[in-house]
């Protein structure tokens, strides 16, 4: 890949210092003064780059690697050529993530859209809104009446912050996002096009066969260190709040219904849909394309496999998959049984479809 001007390399960190900061052991102390400037994949890492390897199946990539160092565990370290210093750790994935935050701090948040700082003259800030010192508002953003925004927060171009919304400190609200009826904590990242705080989907049968809209007068509460992906939608509560717990990370194109409560440090992958009033515990991981029924509970630490349909409660710590979702061991047994029956059926027919 040619030089990437979107994310320029770091001015340089000593390899020895980097090892200390990411909690890894530098096996070759004589390499401590090498300079590291960027991250790169193993196969094209060059001097100044740092890379990592998790699996032996990629060992061939080491033949073209010229990295300043490689992060790996003990099982991989024996494969690394003597010319490449090893940063040894039992958690190479985590160590590499930490290295990336140090070398590419600018890439950790959505980029600026303008070179200006402060409040752009093309932005609209209602006279009753309160902005702490250090807030940045890009052109065409709108800050509604009575909104409050903490210092260090950046509101990107075209974003809309509704009346009375509270946003904490050091947040990033990206281009084109809209936030209504919400209280947002500190160090929250909201990516482009996200929609937060709009009406939930609630209707009652009408007297003549139509539908009557149920009023949605709740809020959205987003706690500290949450990240919300592009074009994700989070509806406000009907009468209670929709809550996203501290440290939870939500991918792009996720729909979260009204009154949903998501715990702390959860991971929710793209195209998940969570129906209203479902409660999700702490540390829950939900794979891509999962549908979650409303008014159910998913316990702490549960894991849901991609493309599953969760129709009923999931106990804490369990791994569920399939449609309807069930314990993973049962799901895999059912899949194996169906594959066996299909194979036997094909044999009886001589391998030809009817």
Swiss-Prot record:
Q: What class of enzyme is it?
A: transferase
**InterPro entries the record matches:** Hexapep, Hexapep_transf_CS, LpxD, Trimer_LpxA-like_sf, UDP_GlcNAc_AcTrfase_non-rep
Listed A to Z, the keywords are: Acyltransferase, Lipid A biosynthesis, Lipid biosynthesis, Lipid metabolism, Repeat, Transferase
Q: Name one GO cellular component term.
A: membrane
Q: Which Pfam families match?
A: Hexapep, LpxD
Q: Can you name one GO molecular function term for this protein?
A: N-acyltransferase activity
Pathway-wise, it operates in: Bacterial outer membrane biogenesis; LPS lipid A biosynthesis
- Catalytic activity, reaction form: a UDP-3-O-[(3R)-3-hydroxyacyl]-alpha-D-glucosamine + a (3R)-hydroxyacyl-[ACP] = a UDP-2-N,3-O-bis[(3R)-3-hydroxyacyl]-alpha-D-glucosamine + holo-[ACP] + H(+)
Q: Which residues form the active site?
A: 258 (proton acceptor)
| PROSITE patterns, per the entry | HEXAPEP_TRANSFERASES
> Which residue spans traverse the membrane?
none
Q: Which domain of life is it from?
A: Bacteria
SUPFAM superfamilies, per database record: Trimeric LpxA-like enzymes (SSF51161)
EC number(s) given by UniProt: 2.3.1.191
An individual GO BP term = lipid A biosynthetic process
Query: What protein family does this chain belong to?
Result: Belongs to the transferase hexapeptide repeat family. LpxD subfamily.
**HAMAP family registered for this protein in UniProt:** LpxD
So what does this one do? Catalyzes the N-acylation of UDP-3-O-acylglucosamine using 3-hydroxyacyl-ACP as the acyl donor. Is involved in the biosynthesis of lipid A, a phosphorylated glycolipid that anchors the lipopolysaccharide to the outer membrane of the cell.
Describe its partners and assembly state.
Answer: Homotrimer.
Q: What is this protein called?
A: UDP-3-O-acylglucosamine N-acyltransferase
